[in-house]
Amino acid sequence: MSELLRARSQSSERGNDQESSQPVGSVIVQEPTEEKRQEEEPPTDNQGIAPSGEIENQAVPAFQGPDMEAFQQELALLKIEDEPGDGPDVREGIMPTFDLTKVLEAGDAQP
């Protein structure tokens, strides 16, 4: 089917109003045999799931060494940043206040 569509789209790209002079063969779609269907189906047993419904960690490697220490430090920083309040990049001081009447008057003035 895709060959038929490809041949027609190529002939229209060339600007020819005539059908392509190349013969287009029929496309045969083959259904997979019963053996192949069985091979393609995923296993139906629930591997890694305990009867209680919890997922078992069978092949999860444990963190060890300097990577674990770096991971813990990064995790601690993330926890600090996620807490409500000011972050480390907030400067202490008084924020400037704007008098809206002065701002509006300045906007009305024409140069």
UniProtKB/Swiss-Prot annotation:
Q: Which organism is it from?
A: Homo sapiens (Human)
- The molecule here is called P antigen family member 2
Q: Which SMART domains does this UniProt record tie to the protein?
A: GAGE
The similarity annotation says: Belongs to the GAGE family.
Where does the record place Polar residues bias?
8-24
| Pfam (any one) | GAGE
Q: Which InterPro entries match?
A: GAGE (IPR031320), GAGE_fam (IPR008625)
Q: Where is this region: Disordered?
A: 1-66
PANTHER family the record matches: G ANTIGEN FAMILY E MEMBER 3-RELATED, P ANTIGEN FAMILY MEMBER 5-RELATED
